Amino acid sequence: MAKTKNKRKGRKTRRPTKAELEKQRAIKRMVFALFMAFVLFFAIFKLGRVGVTVYNIIRLMVGSLAYPFIFAALIYLFATKWLKKHDGLVGGFVITMLGMLLEWQAYLFSLATMKDQSVIKGTLVIVFSDLSKFRVANFAGGGFLGALLYMPVAFLFSNIGSFLIGGLFLLLGLFLMSPWDVYDVMNFFKDSYAKWQVKRQENREKRFAQKEEARLLAQQAVQEAQESATFDHGLNAAIDLETGEVLDQAQTIDLDDFDGQVHKEPEIIGYQSDPEGEALEAEVPAAEQTSQLPKEEDMSDESLEVDFTPKTTLHYKLPGIDLFAKDKPKNQSKEKRLVRDNIKILEETFTSFGIKANVERAEIGPSVTKYEVKPAVGVRVNRISNLADDLALALAAQDVRIEAPIPGKSLVGIEVPNSEVATVTFRELWEQAKASPDKLLEVPLGKAVNGSVRSFDLAKMPHILVAGSTGSGKSVAVNGIIASILMKARPDQIKFMMIDPKMVELSVYNDIPHLLIPVVTNPRKASKALQKVVDEMENRYELFSHFGVRNIAGYNAKVEEFNRHSETKHIPLPLLVVIVDELADLMMVASKEVEDAIIRLGQKARAAGIHMILATQRPSVDVISGLIKANVPSRIAFAVSSGTDSRTILDENGAEKLLGRGDMLFKPIDENHPVRLQGSFISDDDVERIVSFIKEQAEADYDESFDPGEVSEDDNSNGNGGNSEGDPLFEDAKALVLETQKASASMLQRRLSVGFNRATRLMEELEEAGVIGPAEGTKPRKVLQSN
């Protein structure tokens, strides 16, 4: 051990020389510089998440001055010795950077979106938002360093003072970086000012002499021209004051025709309380003209089973608008002030995202304000469409709907909710609409953004689907449609069949003379009632075929012509409106029967004078099937929870952006894009008043031929069909099982087009009848009978 220790003590470790240490440090610096240059290269071009993250970390410190900072860092890494020889250059650059940081930070907090926000917190929120999403999108000002510099300066000198101080820093820094001396600069400005004063005095004297000479020459020329013009051209001749020559009339300049390029302020149109109504004109099929009068025996053909007993309505009086309550007009003067601020915010937001666009026009509607934006040439429309969430954030709005582009205009519409919603009452809408007494099915639906009343004619539609979530205004809209028709039509002109499985929405209309039968609330009865309407449609077509007409208008024209030439009077066929308040409940109970009836009515009922209004609060594909949508082309969408529901109703997004409370998108059959409307509000008291008035005019006269009859409890309990004794599909299911020698609920669903509940009950009935055996776990059931 002693020898080993002595050996260790005997060894001497060699210390590196200064040159070697300097070389090692140089190698380390070079490796570090290359590594940093490699990282900064990714940051400069924002390559991948690493590049974006490093770039955002630099932005966190110096904001949008990341590029100058990166280049300065590269120079420092690779030119350290050169920088040591130019201390003034380094100091000037630092002062210039401080001035730029202050300028950028002052500009950031001059924007409307950043006012009244904490300086440091607001800056960090912007950068961390981009950092978390791996993007570089928002303007970050001067970053954390700029915020620290801006806080005391803005506190002492305000935001404008920060701009001025930042400018002084910039000038001072640039001066220090330049090779000039202070005295040289002062002498330069002094000499330049002296030369400018001398030149200014010379130009002033020269202009004075030229004006004096021109004035004398002009006076002399005008006198000579006036003397000659009095004799040769009359007293009204035009004279050029510079040359003294007489001008022709064709040479005179009309200042009114001068079209200068003047920048105009955006036009702001306030919400009008009494705009002109704008109706969707619909052409009702005209009555066919015929010179041959129908024979009396043809009009009384008993084989057609049509009731021609005249029913008098001489004492029936149509309801007046006084039955509906008035509403106090809303003062929306506050909205105009907000609109001006929002226009500025919109344009600043577009600028921050690098989009050149100006707000050309703003229309204040009852519930939303529509800003019409003109994008510059070369700006893609989808760039504005993709900013919906960012615009909602900048405007502090609940939601923003973008219409890109506006149909018929080279503009993009941005719809922003108002701070206060102006209620549109049914009375206000009715008084402002251009009502046509001869169009019984024309209904004022709501007000557009510009305040105009939009109406639709159900005869043109000819069927309407109304869908929206609970509380969005769907039932109120249906009540408004019914009230509009009741205001125009007598009981002999229009009949209603109302189906209300919820039993609370349409029951108030019971016992009015316009009803064919009492309001149907039983879902099983509803499917049978719809089948009765289909039978009525077929009967009417047989009637049209017998008399050689194509539609109800032609038939009623023949009846009217017959009544003028015959003592026996007949009544024309009334229009029939079928209203279903909750389609989803019917589809759950008898989907196949209800869907078949709706499809047949949708395809053929228009010419027969039968129209449908289908309402549902569950706009899913199992309720609104593809066949139903194909045969009900006109849609009204209220607020829904998702874009999927909106596409189910309208075949496009948009309804998920609505506000509720009557805010709707109306897409009629003759328009490619939906129109946003604010629906009218009709209260329960208004409905009760008009119903009471109508009941006083006439009593209900129900038609027993449309009565669906009684439904047993067993029928009610069966979801998609009847019991084992009365189920019409039992024999079909039995034949199918015996033919295939297989039995399963899924097979019955596919082959018979029934729901799962009904298929399961059919399996139970087949088991009770001894056709199939009992269930054996996961094994298929045995078929006990053969074909």
From Swiss-Prot:
Entry GO MF terms: ATP binding; ATP hydrolysis activity; DNA binding
Keyword field contains ATP-binding: yes
Start-end of Acidic residues biased regions: 702-716
Positions annotated to bind ATP: 471-476
Keyword Cell cycle appears in the UniProt entry: yes
SMART domains: AAA, Ftsk_gamma
Chief site of localization: membrane
Gene Ontology cellular-component annotations: plasma membrane
Subcellular location: Cell membrane
Role, per record: Essential cell division protein that coordinates cell division and chromosome segregation. The N-terminus is involved in assembly of the cell-division machinery. The C-terminus functions as a DNA motor that moves dsDNA in an ATP-dependent manner towards the difSL recombination site, which is located within the replication terminus region. Required for activation of the XerS recombinase, allowing activation of chromosome unlinking by recombination.
Subunit structure: Homohexamer. Forms a ring that surrounds DNA.
Free-text comment about domains: Consists of an N-terminal domain, which is sufficient for the localization to the septal ring and is required for cell division, followed by a linker domain, and a C-terminal domain, which forms the translocation motor involved in chromosome segregation. The C-terminal domain can be further subdivided into alpha, beta and gamma subdomains. The alpha and beta subdomains form the DNA pump, and the gamma subdomain is a regulatory subdomain.
FtsK domain sequence ranges: 450-647
Membrane-side (Cytoplasmic) residue stretches: 184-787
Protein name: DNA translocase FtsK
Ranges of compositional bias, category Basic residues: 1-16
Gene Ontology biological-process entries: cell division; chromosome segregation
Swiss-Prot/TrEMBL keywords: ATP-binding, Cell cycle, Cell division, Cell membrane, Chromosome partition, DNA-binding, Membrane, Nucleotide-binding, Transmembrane, Transmembrane helix
Family in the record: Belongs to the FtsK/SpoIIIE/SftA family.
Organism (species): Streptococcus mutans serotype c (strain ATCC 700610 / UA159)
Membrane-topology descriptor: Multi-pass membrane protein
Span list, region Disordered: 1-21, 279-303, 702-729
InterPro entries: AAA+_ATPase, FtsK/SpoIIIE/SftA, FtsK_alpha, FtsK_dom, Ftsk_gamma, P-loop_NTPase, WH-like_DNA-bd_sf, WH_DNA-bd_sf
Transmembrane portions of the chain: 31-53, 57-79, 92-114, 134-156, 161-183
